[in-house]
Amino acid sequence: MTSEPGLSGGIIAAGEGSRLRQAGWTVPKPMVPVAGVPLIESTIRNFVAVGISRLSIIVNEQERDCAAWVLARFSELDLRVIVKTTASSLESFREVAGAPEAGRMLVSTVDAWCRPDDFTRFVSSALRRPRDATVLAVTPLIDDERPLGVKMDAEGRVTALDVASPALVTAGVYLVSERARRLEPPPHLGRLREHLGWLLDSGEPMFGEVIETVVDVDRAEDVALAESLAAARPSR
């Protein structure tokens, strides 16, 4: 077991997946398979692999069947499934992060596909950071059309976000401090990436930990890349 006692998790799975639908997938985005396993299943299994059994998951209102599938598939877990169509990634994040459990929360987007061993290494490293800090998973694998570049100092502390020509970008997995979970953002913020920048500017201690192989699964080519990584020999 990698996680600390009582650590809860959150999964953001409320996006529409429009580009995958245009590419021919007929299932909701969380149910898109990579190497035969739906994204939502592989994400949940990553949380289970680090010892987290209490999860808050948000899906949109067109994904009620997905919510029912998750509850049936993982009946042994303590799941809080929110069925709500949100206006933004930030709203979805706040729905998940607002769960009643105290303390830090490990949050992942459903389309941040990575192998369990890489996920486990990230969580192990992130938990060694100060409890009052938020830790971002960052990756050198830049396949996103609009990546959020991260600049860090030699100790891994994040010094700037949304930097040009980055060597590392956010990977869609976050260990969020209790403070950051409860802070009310300014009303003009609409996207999670903007919220992260605001947290950093507001004095939130923020660190980055590298996940070498993580894919933001938004397009057909992303599915192909994730499947090639799934078939490759796991890193050690």
PLM region descriptions:
Residues L7, S53-R54, G103, D132:
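Short acidic/polar active-site loop segments enriched in Thr and Asp
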Residues R54-N60, L136-V138:
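Short internal beta-strands
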Residues T26-E41:
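Short catalytic helix/loop segments, enriched in acidic residues and glycine
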Residues C66-D153:
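Conserved beta-loop-beta/alpha segment of the NTase-like Rossmann-fold superfamily
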Residues M1-W25, E204:
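N-terminal nucleotide-binding beta1-loop-alpha1 segment
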Residues Q62-R64:
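A conserved acidic beta->alpha catalytic loop
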Residues V37-R54, E95:
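A short, N-terminal amphipathic alpha-helix
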Residues S124-L127, I142, R157-R236:
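Catalytic-core segments of class I nucleotidyltransferases/pyrophosphorylases
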